[in-house]
């Protein structure tokens, strides 16, 4: 069926939680687009920080235990989602994560509605059981990939024909991230909150606080920097139990060992990322594994920040380093370094700090 502005679809988006992350941000953006087109976005999740934003954008929230990987809960969710879809007059069930995707697929089959999924996460190629579990993301009418890199991985790992895969790169609203829209008073207040001193070079790592995002590598690289700087790490320092995570403790211990404790700020969850980018002089995304897309690199560039990213995955599609050190900025959007290469990262950090 082809939809027009007069027949925009009612979409059921199923996502485990609505906290910070690329999949969650895309759920909000889809809600805005559907509402603007005259359709409806009904989001089934266990709630989170973005729930209010989705409602404000015209979406509807239905709470259900769709984050669970318990087979019994997944089975129970089949009827639950089928009932929701019928009651809400849903046209398409759109899964955004693997656990609820199985329930979504079977619910769609039960009521005779189309099912599709967006592959936001890494496409694992082992073990075989994990590949089978993840294959639910490719069993619908279509599969949406967030980058050419992800699309290629889907084809290789899941043996999916290219014509079944739609590549829809993530993005951002450049107006929202334009630093000209940020008040100087707000920047000054945020700098004070993060203990940023005058003339400090502010390095921001806008990522979840988890090992594969590479914060430890960044900490080691910053330890070799010369000059006056401040390192800001975003992301919740607590684990699912509410206690300080093991990784956060390791970062703090290493910062103490390298003498960086006074230079390091754990910012926690940051709701106002445009303001965070406005405070920073540089954004660094040193992921150890290839990012499927890497939305924060796009956001940072929209905020006119120079970026340093890992030379892998989706970053290769969004961060171009041709002529990076020339006077011309025609082709330059940032710098890429090999994942995990501390010395190379230190060198690039020093290069940008000296510009």
Show which residues each predicted segment covers.
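A conserved mid-protein helix/loop that constitutes part of the nucleotide-sugar donor-binding site
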Residues: 24-29, 201, 208-224, 343
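A conserved nucleotide-sugar
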Residues: 40, 197-201, 215-265
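Short hydrophobic beta-strand element within catalytic cores of glycosyltransferases
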Residues: 43, 306-309, 316-320, 326-328
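Short alpha-helical donor nucleotide-sugar binding micro-motif in glycosyltransferases
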Residues: 85, 269-270, 276-280, 295
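Short His-centered aromatic/hydrophobic patch
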Residues: 95-101, 119
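A conserved, positively charged/aromatic
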Residues: 109, 115-145, 152
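A short, active-site helix/loop in glycosyltransferases that binds the activated sugar's phosphate group
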Residues: 140-167, 172-177
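Conserved acidic donor-binding segment of nucleotide-sugar-dependent glycosyltransferases
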Residues: 320-342, 351-355
């Amino acid at each position: 069926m082809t939809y027009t502005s007069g027949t925009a679809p009612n979409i059921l988006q199923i996502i485990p939680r609505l906290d910070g992350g690329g999949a969650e941000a895309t759920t909000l953006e889809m809600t805005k687009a559907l509402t603007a087109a005259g359709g409806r976005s009904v989001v089934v999740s266990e709630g989170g920080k973005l729930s209010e934003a989705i409602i404000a954008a015209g979406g509807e929230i239905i709470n259900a235990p769709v984050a669970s990987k318990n087979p019994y809960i997944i089975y129970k969710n089949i009827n639950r989602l089928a009932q929701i879809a019928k009651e809400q007059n849903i046209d398409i069930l759109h899964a955004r994560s693997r656990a609820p995707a199985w329930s979504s697929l079977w619910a769609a089959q039960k009521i005779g509605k189309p099912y599709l999924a967006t592959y936001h996460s890494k496409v694992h190629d082992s073990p075989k059981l994990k590949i089978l579990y993840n294959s639910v993301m490719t069993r619908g009418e279509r599969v949406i990939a967030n980058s050419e890199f992800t699309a290629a991985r889907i084809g290789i790992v899941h043996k999916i024909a290219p014509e079944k895969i739609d590549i829809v790169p993530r993005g951002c609203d450049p107006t929202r991230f334009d630093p000209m829209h940020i008040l100087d008073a707000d920047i000054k207040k945020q700098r004070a909150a993060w203990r940023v001193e005058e003339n400090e070079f502010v390095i921001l790592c806008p990522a979840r606080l988890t090992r594969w995002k590479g914060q430890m590598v960044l900490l080691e690289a910053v330890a070799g920097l010369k000059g006056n700087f401040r390192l800001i790490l975003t992301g919740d320092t607590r684990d699912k139990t509410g206690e300080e995570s093991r990784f956060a403790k390791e970062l703090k211990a290493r910062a103490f060992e390298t003498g960086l404790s006074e230079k390091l700020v754990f910012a926690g969850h940051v709701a106002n990322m445009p303001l965070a980018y406005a405070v920073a002089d540089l954004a660094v995304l040193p992921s150890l594994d290839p990012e499927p897309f890497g939305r924060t690199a796009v956001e940072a560039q929209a905020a006119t920040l120079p970026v340093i990213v890992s030379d892998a995955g989706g970053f290769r599609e969004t961060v171009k380093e041709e002529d990076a050190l020339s006077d011309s900025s025609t082709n330059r959007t940032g710098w890429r370094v090999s994942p995990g290469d501390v010395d190379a990262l230190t060198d690039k950090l020093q290069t940008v700090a000296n510009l």
